[in-house]
Amino acid sequence: MLRYPYFCRMYKECLSCWLESGIPNLGVWPKRIHTTAEKYREYEAREQTDQTQVQELHRSQDRDFETMAKLHIPVMVDEVVHCLSPQKGQIFLDMTFGSGGHTKAILQKESDIVLYALDRDPTAYALAEHLSELYPKQIRAMLGQFSQAEALLMKAGVQPGTFDGVLMDLGCSSMQLDTPERGSSLRKDGPLDIRMDGGRNISSLCYLYTERLTTAIYLYCHQDFPGSSHICEQ
């Protein structure tokens, strides 16, 4: 069983001390991991579906990648670049590539690096592939979930302890929230979906019955107003 000690640079020294002293450490990725064989089986089972989504995305109407990227403004860009402090020849992993804002900023700071860009969103993966065309020696685009990271990295030939820094910017981005077709927008009308990778699994709508939605409104809004059932039925 393999464990990849991929640490965010800002915690690198502290986490190393914890490891040496045997103290459980929350920075190790992943904390729980299946055997390598299990990871490969899971990865191979989903890879074909993922690639089909990406091919369909590329065959769809022409997309302005720069416009798509501008939909989301990454947070704390200067702080991230300062924290990672990229140096010539180093290798990094961006586990939430999104529209690539952080990755671009890192490359602007130091272009002579290698950066693995992971995202489960086919749209984000398409953006990563587009960026890899501009930086063919620097960007390695990967499509998959966090749980698939080990299998993807092993397939790419990445050895344990390779990365000099890892970035995770967790949460949804404007690409999901401002695009009603994605089914996650709170600002615009659109189908209910809320999946990051819309081609996999059954739509969330299938599981959200009126009673469950009514309960959710009560729990999360902390009130039971008369119109809640009507809202859910709509």
UniProtKB/Swiss-Prot annotation:
It holds the Pfam family Methyltransf_5. InterPro entries: RsmH (IPR002903), SAM-dep_MeTrfase_MraW_recog (IPR023397), SAM-dependent_MTases_sf (IPR029063). It comes from Homo sapiens (Human). One of its GO terms (biological process) is rRNA base methylation. The gene is METTL15P1. SUPFAM superfamilies: S-adenosyl-L-methionine-dependent methyltransferases. S-adenosyl-L-methionine binds at G100, G101, H102, D119, F146, D169, Q176. Keywords: Methyltransferase, S-adenosyl-L-methionine, Transferase. GO terms for molecular function: rRNA (cytosine-N4-)-methyltransferase activity. Its EC number is 2.1.1.-. This is Putative methyltransferase-like protein 15P1. Probable S-adenosyl-L-methionine-dependent methyltransferase. Belongs to the methyltransferase superfamily. RsmH family.
